[in-house]
Amino acid sequence: MTRALVIVLDSVGIGGAPDGAAYGDGGADTLGHIAEACAEGRGDRPGLRAGPLRLPHLAGLGLGLAAREASGRMPPGLAPDGPVAGAWGHAVETARGKDTVSGHWEIAGAPVDFDWGRFPATRPSFPPDLTRALIEEGNLPGILGDCHASGTAVIEAYGAEHLRSGKPICYTSVDSVFQIAAHEEAFGLERLYALCGIARRLCDPYRIGRVIARPFAGSAGTGFVRTANRRDFATPPPGDTLLDRLAAAGRPLVSVGKIGDIFAHRHTGTEVKPAGNDACLDAALAAFADLGPGGLVFANLVDFDTEYGHRRDVPGYAAALERFDARLPEIRAALRPGDLCLVTADHGNDPTWTGTDHTREQVPVLAFGPGQRPGPIGRREGLADIGATVAAHLGLALPAGRSWL
């Protein structure tokens, strides 16, 4: 029986969103702008990388071709050197947003057809009733932040005061999120998780997609750093997803990285959550080696987004792309006859763009495996086509999306 491996390169958009201007993202192009920056020497960092962006294996699967169709231009150095080895195309998100949850749910066949709630870019940002309830139920002396902020900047700004006062740092962004940062030792990791559970319930009436625990360590003297113990508290998907259909059919499923959090741990199978892209890919390949017939390994590689996109770090993002590309032969070697591997993204996060938020972009769709027919699959009018294709490959059906098989 067939098997499938889906790898989401978190935030690796390819530009060309037809409605990008409505989000302030007209012209945003994560992959294209990274490639251009590297070609111009702006992607160099001593000891990390230098020169043009080199992604020969992804280019050979049609990544550059997909980017050209989406954005209208070929990213420098990403033209394939010979026949393309997989099916390639690009997809337009139908959900009205550019957040992780919407992107992943749509990939899994449950497009978001409503508007998420968001907090305004004011100070304070949160409704007073929400703040009062969180302080009371969480037994807190108060909160810090209460604003739109970058995750790294906010702990630099409030970390020392947090340690002195015991007040957690609460902040948001243009996405539908309520984030709580607290020191792992001084505040306590389990206490932070419990507080986020309270916040999850309190945020439900506001239709907030995720409450995110953002633990950090360090001191004012040595500096503060976020740890790997992030946890997302998402609201459940609004309808059946590919994961639900797999569970109903009794199929094996392994969720790697933050997939479990994104789907509110509903029918997410065996969850594995290592830290870092390489560790997540190691876990995905190990799980796939043992995966039974008709099963799925669903992996998210988040470092592209959290470590490099939000931080607007072009050299770091480029190096991470090159590292993933170098492991593609390993991924292809893991595929048996009847297996399908699909590489895609959930949104963009252009590190050359203004601000620190996600960018509205199309995403690449690259599908390959023994016996898979190579060639263009065109523009997909919704990320749900990805889930529909995986479902069809596994002999299942989804209510949304159209398979290209």
UniProtKB/Swiss-Prot annotation:
Gene Ontology terms for molecular function: magnesium ion binding; manganese ion binding; phosphopentomutase activity
GO cellular component: a single term: cytosol
Record: residues binding Mn(2+) 2: 305, 310, 358
Compartments, record wording: Cytoplasm
Top EC class of this enzyme: isomerase
Stored InterPro entries: Alkaline_phosphatase_core_sf, DeoB, Metalloenzyme, Phosphopentomutase_DeoB_cap_sf
Pathway noted in the entry: Carbohydrate degradation; 2-deoxy-D-ribose 1-phosphate degradation; D-glyceraldehyde 3-phosphate and acetaldehyde from 2-deoxy-alpha-D-ribose 1-phosphate: step 1/2
Cofactor note: Binds 2 manganese ions.
Any one Pfam family match given in the protein's UniProt record, by short name: Metalloenzyme
Keywords from the named record: Cytoplasm, Isomerase, Manganese, Metal-binding
Main subcellular localisation: cytoplasm
GO BP of this protein: 2-deoxyribose 1-phosphate catabolic process; 5-phosphoribose 1-diphosphate biosynthetic process; metabolic compound salvage; nucleotide metabolic process
Cofactor or coenzyme needed: Mn(2+)
Binding site for Mn(2+) 1: 10, 346-347
Keyword Secreted included in the entry's annotation: no
Catalysed transformations (reactions): 2-deoxy-alpha-D-ribose 1-phosphate = 2-deoxy-D-ribose 5-phosphate; alpha-D-ribose 1-phosphate = D-ribose 5-phosphate
EC number: 5.4.2.7
Role, per record: Isomerase that catalyzes the conversion of deoxy-ribose 1-phosphate (dRib-1-P) and ribose 1-phosphate (Rib-1-P) to deoxy-ribose 5-phosphate (dRib-5-P) and ribose 5-phosphate (Rib-5-P), respectively.
UniProt similarity note: Belongs to the phosphopentomutase family.
Protein name: Phosphopentomutase
Naturally occurring in which organism (per UniProt): Methylobacterium sp. (strain 4-46)
